[in-house]
Every structure is written in structure tokens, then in C-alpha cells.
């Protein structure tokens, strides 16, 4: 099958520097809506991916995201939200970005060209066939991600990918692929825009639904949320009051008993 980089295609919007701010805002918003439409088309693929991640998580496996640039940062962002939101240990959902931590703050473009580095990074986390790895790359060609996913398949580790081009090299090494075709970017080739938006929406679904299936949500409440600041402490108190029908004093007492998170007070007995 042929491979064509839609993500590098010429923008549908011309002479941007000659447009008014209002025109630019409306044009970008129109393209953002196209990202939503693209995600809508791949919901069955997202469903299939999550249905295959969930058993791994439930059996004690881990979820890894690997990516470079914006794609890698989005994976790290999604992973970093799991401990405070769902009470998971930091090693349960892990985001790896080409170039490591410095790449979160500044662009280290050369780091993405190493085919073997992602596997080294995964090996540092003692990756096993009980884990699941998702490669994130708008183009689907990033060597860091392609090499990492290929090595995972070679070692019988389940894989998925989130890409914005069809029939990409990365898709070849994904057991479960999500090809979310957002079309040309507003700014030609700037995949941090629509592609990044679509990737973030899909990552939201992957982590949130996986955690729901793993028992970290009751009703629509985050029952394993970490009470790490005043805002979250108030939220925890409100959840306990609503779920158990107790007053604020009793909720505070239960919070003190639970010490760390709110799952025990809110679980049915």
C-alpha cells in the first residue's frame, strides 16, 4: 500500500500574514472542528485498542506511551495525570519522549532519529510481554517510535499506535492502529495543531476508560483521587458527602481515616 504524508500537505489557507486576527481565529477554529470529525471516524479503532489494553492493566501490566516532540510530550502529559486522578503508582502509565526530560521543556529534534533508543528506554523500565506500548507520531515515520514499536513486536509485547497518516511505517508494527486523518494543518506541516489535538482527545479516552475499567471510578466519581492540595481535599470531601449521604464533619473524619485517598470510604460494604 502506498504511503503519503497528508500531515505535510499544503495548508488550505493562503496568505495568512494578510488576514485579520478575527479571520485567523475563525479559520483555526474551523480546522479544530475538523480534528473532532476525524476522531469521530476512528472511534471503533479506539474502542478496540482500549478493550485490549484493559485486561493487561487489570492483570498488573503497565501502559507505555512512546513519542517524540509534541507527540511525546502529549504522552508524558497523559501519563502524569494518572497518579493524581486515579491514585495509580507512577510506573503504571509511563510516558517516554525522545530526548528524555529535557525534551519536555525544549526542542531536541535530533533525538527522534535514533531507531534503537526507545527500546533502550523501555528496557530501563524492565518492559515485559505483560505490558502494552502505544507509539504516538503524527507522521507515522519518527525513527524513535518506529524502532521502539518494532522491537516490542519482536519481543511479543502488545502494541498500538496513534498516527495521522494512512499506511505509515509505524502502523506496520502496531497490533492495534488508530489512523486519525485530520488533513493538512492550518500552518503547513505544523502537526502540533490539529494532529496534536486529535492525539490528545484519543489519549484522554485511552487513559480515562482504562482506569474506569480498572475500578478507579464509581458512578462518575474519581474514588482513588489523591488529596494533594486544598482543591482536591474539598473535592474529596464533597464526593464522600454525596456518595455516603453524610455531613461535612463525618466526611472529614472519614478522610482522616483514609489518610491518602478516598476509595475506602466510598466503596460499598
Name what the model sees in each region.
Residues 41-56:
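A short, well-structured juxtamembrane/interface segment
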Residues 1-38:
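Cofactor-/ligand-binding subdomain signature composed of acidic, glycine-rich
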Amino acid at each position: 500500500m502506498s504511503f503519503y504524508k497528508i500531515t505535510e500537505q499544503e495548508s488550505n489557507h493562503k496568505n495568512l500574514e494578510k488576514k485579520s486576527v478575527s479571520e485567523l481565529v475563525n479559520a483555526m477554529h474551523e480546522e479544530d472542528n475538523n480534528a473532532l470529525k476525524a476522531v469521530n471516524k476512528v472511534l471503533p479503532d479506539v474502542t478496540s485498542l482500549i478493550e485490549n489494553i484493559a485486561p493487561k492493566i487489570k492483570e498488573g501490566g503497565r501502559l507505555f506511551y512512546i513519542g517524540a516532540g509534541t507527540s511525546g510530550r502529549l504522552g508524558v502529559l497523559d501519563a502524569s495525570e494518572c497518579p493524581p486522578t486515579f491514585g495509580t503508582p507512577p510506573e503504571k502509565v509511563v510516558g517516554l519522549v525522545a530526548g528524555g526530560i529535557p525534551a519536555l521543556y525544549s526542542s531536541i529534534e535530533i533525538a527522534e532519529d535514533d531507531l534503537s533508543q526507545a527500546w533502550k528506554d523501555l528496557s530501563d523500565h524492565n518492559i515485559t510481554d505483560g505490558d502494552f506500548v502505544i507509539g504516538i507520531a503524527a507522521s507515522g515515520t519518527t525513527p524513535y517510535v518506529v524502532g521502539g514499536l518494532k522491537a516490542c513486536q519482536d519481543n511479543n509485547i502488545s502494541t498500538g499506535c496513534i498516527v495521522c497518516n494512512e499506511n505509515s511505517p509505524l502502523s506496520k508494527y502496531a497490533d492495534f492502529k488508530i489512523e486519525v486523518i485530520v488533513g493538512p494543518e492550518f500552518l503547513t506541516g505544523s502537526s502540533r495543531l490539529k494532529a496534536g489535538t486529535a492525539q490528545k482527545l484519543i489519549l484522554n479516552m485511552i487513559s480515562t476508560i482504562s482506569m474506569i475499567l480498572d475500578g478507579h471510578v464509581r458512578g462518575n466519581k474519581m474514588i482513588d483521587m489523591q488529596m494533594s492540595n486544598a482543591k482536591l481535599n474539598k473535592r474529596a470531601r464533597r464526593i464522600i458527602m454525596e456518595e455516603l449521604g453524610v455531613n461535612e464533619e463525618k466526611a472529614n473524619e472519614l478522610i482522616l481515616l483514609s489518610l491518602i485517598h478516598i476509595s475506602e470510604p466510598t466503596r460499598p460494604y
